[in-house]
Amino acid sequence: MKKEKFVKVMRATDGNGLNQYGAKGNVIMKTEIDEGYKETVFGFEEDGTGYEYDVYYSKTTDTKYKWQATEGSTGLLICFGKTQATCADEVMRRLERMHKVLSYINISANMANMLDHCKELVRNAKI
């Protein structure tokens, strides 16, 4: 990670759904890097717009709330930082839609099994 100025990222959370700024979001991937760690944040805005971006935390900064953000691209977004039910329901809705769309184009048995497995994971997950 190259040295850059660290800035606060309003949507980064401590994993409890809200941070000290009252911002929403879900950090779902944490990667160790040389100078600290990187977290990839996924989520939805109130209007349903999805977002995804990386947050870098430096071990050398004086507080854990000094973050550096990089603009990310919208990908497969599966969490909405309101309630566990909302999050799981949104994941399930997206998987169901994906399954329906793919079934129209004659998906393979492997793909169907993978989607069923994803839905089962969501049902059992403590998101």
Named regions from a protein language model:
Residues M1-E46:
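Negatively charged, low-complexity tracts enriched in Asp/Glu with abundant Ser/Thr
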Residues K30, E52-T60:
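Short amphipathic beta-strand and strand-loop transition segments with alternating hydrophobic
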Residues T40, K100-V101, M114-L115:
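Non-catalytic tandem-repeat scaffold regions and their flanking low-complexity/translocation tails
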Residues S58-G75:
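Short aromatic-glycine-(Arg/Gly/Cys) micro-motifs in beta-strand/loop hairpins
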Residues G72-T86:
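A short, exposed loop/beta-hairpin motif centered on an aromatic-Gly-Thr core
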Residues K82-K100:
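A short, charged, amphipathic alpha-helix used as a generic interaction element across diverse proteins
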Residues Y104-I127:
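Short, mixed-charge low-complexity intrinsically disordered segments
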